[in-house]
Amino acid sequence: WAQAHPRRLSYPAPPDFLGTTFLKQALIELSRDPDVLQEAVQSDSQFARVTEPLWAYLDDLHPHLWREGRDFPKSGPAQVQMLNDGVLDLALSFYPSQASGLIQDGRLPESARTFVFDSGMIGNTHFVAIPYNAAHKAGAMVVANFLMSPEAQAHKAKPDVWGDQTVLDVGELASDKRQLFADIDRGKATLSPSELGPTLLEPHPTWMTRIEQAWQKRYGS
């Protein structure tokens, strides 16, 4: 696609989390043994061997990118602005409803749409934590339980609120709670949960750290 549409693609420069996730997604897709990415990096030689296909891919890809891969968007919002300005044809996001929200806000054209890879995409889940020495643990637990409630999760999923996917298995909820999610107008650019496809596991954090460092040495300005 990049060859057929030169200068119309880019990704945020790592360590921006979207840019780093693009690298991790590519590494999973290109790896001969993706399971090894679930364990910590064992050695410099292992890292070089496992990531060699990634660097070969990027070396081939970058000449076809915006500014021939010599410069990159500084952040996800910067890339979205470039998409809205017609500079790029694609932007990256962790939020399935982000495009619909941006259309509603007038920050993307009505024609913008969301797509995912058939093989799956890296996904994240938000977490809340209560410190061991929290002064008000009981109150914190009440808040955490509320955030996990179907009512709060459905409210968060509305594009004009946050547009974030629920962490709940909607199929396991009572019918009246499932209806909370069914009633959400997700927007014209939002894929349904079934259309999002499989979620790929994040690599072990040591791969992220090493990949960001190696990318900066190879391609950083």
Regions found by a protein language model. Give the residues of each.
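Extracytoplasmic ligand-binding site segments that recognize negatively charged/polar headgroups
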Residues: 1-77
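Sec-exported extracytoplasmic/periplasmic mature domains
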Residues: 3-7, 27-32, 59-66, 84, ...
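Active-site rim elements
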Residues: 11-13, 129-132, 198-202
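Short, well-ordered beta-to-alpha junction loops that form the rim of enzyme active sites
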Residues: 13-15, 93-96, 160
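Extracytoplasmic/secreted proteins, especially bacterial periplasmic and envelope-associated proteins
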Residues: 17, 21-25, 49, 53-60, ...
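Extracytoplasmic/periplasmic substrate-binding proteins
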Residues: 66-133, 178-181
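Conserved C-terminal helix/tail region of periplasmic/extracytoplasmic solute-binding proteins
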Residues: 81, 188-221
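Mature extracytoplasmic/periplasmic domains
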Residues: 121, 126, 130-195
